[in-house]
C-alpha cells in the first residue's frame, strides 16, 4: 500500500518555524530576558553597514513569511524570538544568541526551568557547524555551552573571554586562540 499522511496526523507549526524551515539565507536568531530588540537591531544594522541585505523579523519588524520569495541565499535574516515563540519551536539558526536569562514571564511558564528550557530551543536544533553566542557572565551559560551542538562564542561587557568579544578599559576586543585583537574604542562607536 501507499504511505499516506492525513491532516489528522500533521503537527501544527508556527509561522516563524515555517519561515525558519523555508528560509534560503543564513539565520541569526536572538533571544534572552533583556536586550533582544537592541541586539537584533544592532546586528541587522552592522550587517547592512557591511553591504548585506538583511531581513529583520520575529518580534520586531514586519512578518517575514510573506516575503520569503524575495529573500536570496546571500542575504541574512535576523530574528528576535521570545520564549513564547521558542516554547514549541524547533529551529536551526546558523547563529543563535542568548543575551541573558532572568526570571521572566513566570505568569505564563510554570517555573523558571520551563522558561529556560524554552530559551534553549534556540540552539537545540543547530547543526554541528552552527554557532551559539552566550553572555559569559550569565549563570546559565555553562549549561547552554555544554548542550550546544556546534561551536560556542562568548561576549562580555566586564572583562576578557577566551573565545569571543569583550570590552575592557573602553576598548572592544575579539579573542581567539589565546590572542586578543583590538576591534574599536567604545568612544568611536556612533
Model features per residue range: what roles?
Residues 14-136, 140-149, 166:
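Phosphate-binding loop of NTP-binding sites
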Residues 7, 135, 182-185:
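Helix N-cap / beta->alpha transition motif
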Residues 9, 66-69, 178:
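Ubiquitous "structural anchor" signal
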Residues 1-9:
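Single conserved hydrophobic/aromatic residue that forms the stacking wall/gate
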Residues 109-113, 150-190:
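Adenine nucleotide phosphate-binding catalytic loops in nucleotide-utilizing enzymes
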Residues 9, 125, 144, 175, ...:
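Compositionally biased, intrinsically disordered low-complexity segments
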Amino acid at each position: 500500500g501507499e504511505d499516506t499522511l492525513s491532516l489528522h496526523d500533521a503537527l501544527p507549526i508556527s509561522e516563524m518555524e515555517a519561515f525558519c524551515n523555508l528560509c534560503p539565507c543564513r539565520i541569526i536568531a536572538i533571544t534572552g530576558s533583556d536586550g533582544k530588540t537592541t541586539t537584533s537591531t544592532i546586528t541587522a544594522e552592522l550587517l547592512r553597514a557591511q553591504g548585506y541585505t538583511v531581513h529583520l523579523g520575529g518580534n520586531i519588524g514586519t512578518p517575514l513569511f510573506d516575503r520569503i520569495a524575495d529573500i536570496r541565499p546571500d542575504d541574512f535574516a535576523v530574528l528576535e524570538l521570545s520564549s513564547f515563540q521558542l516554547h514549541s519551536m524547533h529551529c536551526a539558526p546558523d547563529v543563535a544568541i542568548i543575551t541573558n536569562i532572568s526570571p521572566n514571564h513566570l505568569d505564563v511558564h510554570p517555573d523558571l526551568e520551563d522558561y529556560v528550557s524554552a530559551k534553549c530551543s534556540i540552539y537545540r536544533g543547530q547543526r554541528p557547524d552552527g554557532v551559539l553566542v552566550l553572555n559569559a557572565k550569565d549563570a546559565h551559560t555553562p549549561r547552554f555551552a555544554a548542550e550546544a551542538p556546534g561551536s560556542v562564542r562568548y561576549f562580555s561587557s566586564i572583562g576578557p573571554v577566551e573565545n569571543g568579544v569583550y570590552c575592557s578599559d573602553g576598548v572592544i576586543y575579539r579573542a581567539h586562540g589565546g590572542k586578543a585583537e583590538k576591534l574599536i574604542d567604545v568612544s568611536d562607536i556612533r
